[in-house]
Amino acid sequence: MLLASMSLASCDLFEMDNYEEPKETIHGAVVDAETGDSILTDQGSEGIRVRLTQLDYSENASHNPDFYCMADGSFQNTKIFEGYYNVRVDGPFIPLVRETDQGVPLANETKDVKIKGKTEVIFKVKPFLRVEFVGYPTVSNGQITAKVKVTRAISRDEFKSCVEPMG
């Protein structure tokens, strides 16, 4: 028993982390390229995903854990290490990274940024649909009622030219 406790006490579990706590911030928004309006979405794992890949940490860069936009299309992460990152968002819009089913690149609209202090990144995207409130939502007897108008945001031709080559 004594030997087990001595070996446990000497292990690396009790050493301090050799890195300072990350203090840099990335924040921004995902907006409609045509209207400038925020892209409204579900919040959480069904919404817009933000993916960071630190490019200057190692040759075999791996993705940081993904995080998600708020329902209004804005995002913020206040615990990032300073460095150069590739930033990408995925959601209900024409994908920023597109390639054929054979892996041939068609487009890469991600952003490479230096994150130091507070860094803002705005993505202008082409949503598949636009959702607009018609009038104001009302509340009656604890029930919220809202009317919305949903319209196609990109033409069929644009969809075919951007998405169909992906397979």
Where are these regions (language model features)?
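C-terminal motif of bacterial Sec signal peptides marking the signal peptidase cleavage site
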Residues: 6-10
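Structural motif
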Residues: 16-18, 29-45, 153
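Structural beta-strand segments of beta-rich domains
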Residues: 22-26, 142-146
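A short, amphipathic beta-strand motif
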Residues: 24-33, 73
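Short, ordered, surface-exposed loop/turn motifs in non-cytosolic proteins
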Residues: 35-60, 159-163
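Short, acidic Ser/Thr/Gly-rich low-complexity loop/linker segments typical of extracellular
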Residues: 55-74
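A short, solvent-exposed beta-strand micro-motif common in secreted/extracellular proteins
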Residues: 73, 81-100
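Structured interaction patches on ligand/partner-binding surfaces of diverse proteins
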Residues: 92-126
